[in-house]
Amino acid sequence: MPPKCILFYKTAAADERLEAVLERESTAGRLELLGVSAEEQSMVPPARRALPFFAPAAIPGMAFDYAVVIEASAEEKRDRARSRVKRLLPPFLLRLHYKIAAWRFTRKKRRLWQSFDGWGKPIERQPDMALPERSPLGAWSIPAAKTIPARTFLLPGFRMDEYAALRTRGITFLSDNCWGGLMYHTLGMEMTSPFINMFVWTDDFIRLINDLPYYLSQPLVPEKLRERRGAAYPVVLLGDVRLHFNHVTTPDELTAFAEKWYRRRERMDMDTLLIESSFDTPENQAKYESGFAACPYPKLIFTPYPSEKYVYLSAFDENAARYKGDFSDCTRDCAKNDYPGKIPLDFLQTFLTRTAQLPEEEK
């Protein structure tokens, strides 16, 4: 039976690409559209108004598999916010406004670290800490496990049956930067990896992935505060591996972030583990390749130059003005499905079907 889906519109802006994919999957019998929902019925595009309309409050009591959430992208939301400010300030004052706001924010956060006395001490578990579940439809008591973001349908080669199988099986991304978290966001899947919203230098990352059970058994120990690009964040030890929690700005955030780390660690499934990294130059490939080769887990490695063994992202050189020499931005664009070219990898199939494709003696 195909998954039963409800389209939930949080924006009135129609996306022709999305509508085409939904129509294709519905016609192919890979999903069943039960109806539509929105805060206001006028937000439903004309092409979908022939479907039954459900009030949001009625959805939790219905029998359905997924609510497809159609909303404005984060970029569109930021652009709208910026446009409001731009209407009030001329360009030179706008730039000054952002600089002053960033300086004040950083100064305020840095003061909070002056009284932090947890350096060198393991961060204890906080099992009773309330960490609210983030669901795009949480206001209507629809859990994240029953939602799919519209962006997922725009992935290259998307098929609802393969995606539903991937949701059922799960996947554990272990990345040395934000790539894994961005992939979970794009796929609309539960984060079953603790390595989210952080980065790890390559030398540390290789030690980590080659002795993963040991490092996962270690507590998090705050080591020091690091200044980077005008901001300050904590560096946290996991054994002798340094984790850079560059999205953490206060001691309270560190406590909550560490608890998320521990809880996500418990959700890891080593049978669905995928290691992600990149070689930005042939010299780095020569330096680190043997370390990655020794790692016993499936690996996905990107390069900005042609390679028979790794995933070549040709758009890095073709869009030099966009990336300005930062190859990690290019790999993250792949995870966000914002890569300015044809993605040379089908994220939804390669690792979902990996075991089935292996010869019997390699399983």
Predicted stretch roles:
Residues L7-A13, V36-E39, V69-A74, Q126, ...:
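Structural motif
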